[in-house]
UniProtKB/Swiss-Prot annotation:
SUPFAM superfamilies: Class I glutamine amidotransferase-like, P-loop containing nucleoside triphosphate hydrolases. Its cofactor is Mg(2+). The a and c carboxylates of hydrogenobyrinate are activated for nucleophilic attack via formation of a phosphorylated intermediate by ATP. CobB catalyzes first the amidation of the c-carboxylate, and then that of the a-carboxylate. This is Hydrogenobyrinate a,c-diamide synthase. Catalyzes the ATP-dependent amidation of the two carboxylate groups at positions a and c of hydrogenobyrinate, using either L-glutamine or ammonia as the nitrogen source. It comes from Brucella ovis (strain ATCC 25840 / 63/290 / NCTC 10512). GO terms for biological process: cobalamin biosynthetic process.
C-alpha cells in the first residue's frame, strides 16, 4: 500500500483541514483509503472517519512498538485499502524527550513521503529558509511536496513560489485564506465530529477547495513512488479485558483507540457497544465493561439521571464483572463529578474518589506504567494522559499503576482498584515489553 503524510512546521498550520479535504476529495475520486493519525489524539480520527468513511487508526511511534505499527499498516492493506493518508501531530519533528515519537519517526518507519503544510499568512521569502531547514534536518525523512496555506493574494502566492523555486521541492498548491475552513474547538481540542452540525457541508467545501487549488495528479505521483511495508500481522497485542467486552460509546465516552479493539478481536474477544447517555445497559453476558475517556463533565447531569445504566454497572460489579475506566470513564466510576458551574453530580460510586472540572489543572504527557494488579496486563505499559479535571477527594484503596513520565521521572502511583472495578486517568496504548 502506498501513502503519504500531511505534516507541518508547527501546530495550527492547517494540516487537519488539509487532511480532511484531501480525504474527502480522494474518496470522491474512488480511492480506497486508510486514514491514520500520528500520536495519541482521539478527536481528529473521528473527523478522518467522517471524511473518508473508514475507521482511522492512531499510530504512535513513542507509545507503540515498531512491530505493532507495521502490523497495523499491514492490516489496512489486508482490508483492501490502497492509499494510506497520515496526518502528523504538532510540528513534524516534535515528540516526547529529544523529539522521540515524532511524526517524522512515523514517516521514517512506514517509509511515507511528507507533504509539508506551511502557514504563509505572515511571511514571504522567509518560507525558503523554513522549507530548506525542514528538508535538510533529517536525511531519512523525505519532504516531497509543499502546500502553501492561508495565502493572501495572487501576488503573495507568486512571491512564495519564487522563493521556493531554487530548492527543488514541488509546490503542490496554494490555499487562500478562508475563515470558513476553520473547525470549532474546546478545552481538549476540536469539538467532536459527531457534535459538528455542519460537518458534511464543511467536508464537501474543504474537498472543493483542495480540488481547485492542489495539483492532485502531482500528489498522486508522490504517493505512488516505490516503497515496501513490513508484514507483521501476527505481532503480539495487549490482552483483552475479557472474552465479551461491552464498551461505552457516545458523546460522553468517545476516546477509544481502534487498534485496541482490532487487537482484542484478533485475540478472540467479542466487542459490543452501549450508550450510557441513552440510558442503555451493557450486554447481560458481558464479562468485562470498558468506560473509555471523553467528556462526562459536559454530560454529568444526564449520566446522573440514567438509572438503567447506573443499576446495570453496579449489578455487574457486584457479580465480579471487570469494569475498567480511563480518564472520563474513571471519573464516572467515582462518587461525584463537579461540573464547570460548580454543580456536583452523583456518579456510579464504585471507586472512592471525587473529581472536579471546576477546579481545573492541565495534566498532559506520555506515561510509562507498571501495573500493580487488577487488570490482565502484567507487563510495563505505555500510555498518554491529557485532562483538566482534578481529584478533590480520594479515599484509601489499592493503586492501579506505578507511573513515570517520558523521561523516566517517578510520578508516584495512580489509579484505584476495588474488587473487579479499576480505573485511572491514563489512556493505555501498548505494552513496552516482550511478553504479551
Amino acid at each position: 500500500m502506498k501513502g503519504f503524510m500531511i505534516a507541518a512546521p508547527a501546530s495550527g498550520s492547517g494540516k487537519t483541514t488539509v487532511t480532511l479535504g484531501l480525504l474527502r476529495a480522494l474518496k470522491r475520486r474512488g480511492e480506497v483509503l486508510a486514514p491514520v493519525k500520528a500520536g495519541p489524539d482521539y478527536i481528529d480520527p473521528a473527523y478522518h472517519r467522517a471524511a473518508s468513511g473508514v475507521d482511522c487508526f492512531n499510530l504512535d511511534p513513542w507509545a507503540m512498538r515498531p512491530e505493532l505499527i507495521s502490523a497495523l499498516s499491514s492490516r489496512m492493506t489486508e482490508s483492501g485499502a490502497r492509499v494510506l493518508v497520515a496526518e502528523g501531530m504538532m510540528g513534524l519533528f516534535d515528540g516526547a524527550i529529544d523529539g522521540k515519537g515524532s511524526s517524522a519517526d512515523l514517516a521514517r518507519l512506514l517509509d511515507l513521503p511528507v507533504v509539508l503544510v506551511v502557514d504563509c499568512a505572515r511571511q514571504s521569502h522567509s518560507i525558503a529558509a523554513l522549507v530548506w531547514g525542514f528538508s535538510q534536518f533529517r536525511k531519512d525523512v523525505l519532504i516531497e511536496g509543499v502546500i502553501l496555506n492561508r495565502v493572501g493574494s495572487p501576488r503573495h502566492e507568486a512571491m512564495l513560489r519564487g522563493a521556493l523555486a531554487p530548492l527543488g521541492v514541488p509546490v503542490l498548491g496554494a490555499l487562500p485564506r478562508d475563515p470558513a475552513l476553520s473547525l470549532p474547538e474546546r478545552h481538549l481540542g476540536l469539538v467532536q465530529a459527531d457534535e459538528h452540525a455542519g460537518l458534511e457541508s464543511f467536508l464537501e467545501q474543504a474537498a472543493d477547495v483542495m480540488e481547485a487549488h492542489i495539483d492532485m495528479d502531482a500528489l498522486q505521483t508522490i504517493w505512488l513512488r516505490p516503497k515496501r511495508y513490513d508484514a507483521m500481522a501476527n505481532v503480539a497485542r495487549l490482552k483483552p479485558l475479557g472474552n465479551r467486552i461491552a464498551v461505552a460509546r457516545d458523546d460522553a465516552f468517545a476516546f477509544a483507540y481502534m487498534h485496541l479493539f482490532e487487537g482484542w478481536r484478533r485475540r478472540g474477544a467479542e466487542i459490543s457497544f452501549f450508550s450510557p447517555l441513552a440510558d442503555e445497559a451493557p450486554k447481560a453476558d458481558a464479562d468485562a465493561i470498558y468506560l473509555p475517556g471523553g467528556y462526562p463533565e459536559l454530560h454529568a447531569q444526564r449520566l446522573a439521571g440514567a438509572p438503567r445504566f447506573r443499576t446495570a454497572i453496579g449489578d455487574a460489579a457486584a457479580r465480579g464483572v471487570t469494569a475498567y475506566g480511563e480518564c472520563g470513564g474513571y471519573m464516572v466510576l467515582g462518587k461525584t463529578l463537579e461540573d464547570a458551574a460548580g454543580v456536583h453530580h452523583p456518579m456510579l460510586g464504585l471507586l472512592p474518589l471525587e473529581t472536579s472540572f471546576a477546579r481545573r489543572k492541565l495534566h498532559l504527557g506520555y506515561r510509562l506504567l507498571e501495573p500493580l494488579g487488577g487488570l490482565p496486563w502484567d507487563m510495563p505499559l505505555k500510555a498518554h494522559e491529557f485532562h483538566y479535571a482534578s481529584i478533590v477527594r480520594e479515599e484509601k484503596a489499592d493503586r492501579l499503576f506505578r507511573v513515570r513520565d517520558a523521561s523516566g521521572e517517578n510520578l508516584g502511583e495512580a489509579g484505584l482498584r476495588v474488587g473487579s472495578v479499576s480505573g485511572s486517568f491514563m489512556h493505555v496504548i501498548d505494552f513496552s515489553g516482550e511478553a504479551a
